[in-house]
Amino acid sequence: MVKSKKKTITIVIVAIVIMIAIYFLINVFQPPSLDNPESIAWDGTGSRFLISNTGNGKILYTTDFNQYEVLINEGLSSPRGIKFRTDTLYVADNTVIQIIDVKEAKIVESIPIPGSKMLNDIECDKEGLLYCTDTGANKLFIVNPHTKEINSFISPLMTKPNGIVFDGPRRQMFIVCFKPASPILAFNIDTKTFSIFKETLYDNLDGIAIDDLGRIYYSSWGEKCIFMIPQEQNRTIIWQKDLKAPADIYYHLPTNEILVPLFEDNEIKRFKAD
């Protein structure tokens, strides 16, 4: 009886050790993969794409979207929007903007954002100021990464702000919101005022991008597609459809492509902007 109990205990211990070993092998040696990809940025210095993964808190990089490597493995909570500028990656991470030195592959500074709840997308202007939407707090934050000056802006026009992109020629930010029938908002960076650029009938807008011809693209979870506004800005067309949970889209000038992270399918689609 005693021998039987010892044998059973031994078997259980061996089984536990084997399970731990299998778990370790899977998690350590399994190639990195997308986990709720949210945003994409281009690292011009390293000639690679950077991708934020909200699911596991990692920043991955790739050159071809077939194989991925880890840039940042720890220190982030829920990285969403990312913006690359002069060897630095700015990350909207819940209530903090994380600053990453991409050459050293490490977080070098964190800027807590008072009054924030869910920082989402992030953009910068030509002067290097950061503009960060907060979907939870219904705010737009403007952050000077050098002086650490932070200002917040609200508007009755803006509910659950999500994607943001800089319209340089007109010195304004376009913002879309994760709500029913979200308009495209314009935020004038000189006067600090909001206005409606274009009304839409579409729900839960996530990302917005502008190509080199001035065409505007935005993604909708509700309609599961990417819409495009042509240069004339006189209509809106369905540009790509059957896309589940299209997140923060990105225009890549060197290849003239719109890159679309599919948040729930853990995939990135590439479409020529022809």
Please provide the spans of the model-predicted regions:
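Short loop/turn segments that connect beta-strands within beta-propeller blades
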Residues: T62-Q67, D101-K106, N144-K148, N188-K192, ...
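Short coil/turn segments within WD40 beta-propeller repeats
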Residues: N56-G57, T95-V96, A137-N138, P180-S182, ...
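Beta-rich, blade/repeat-based domains predominating
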Residues: P32-G46, E74-N94, P114-L130, P156-A181, ...
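WD40 beta-propeller blade core
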Residues: L60, Q98-I99, F141, P183-L185, ...
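Hydrophobic alpha-helical segments and helix pairs
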Residues: V96-P145
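Beta-propeller domains
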Residues: I51-E69
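A short beta-strand motif characteristic of beta-propeller blades
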Residues: L25-P32, N66-N73, K106-P112, K148-S155, ...
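N-terminal Sec-pathway targeting helices
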Residues: M1-I16
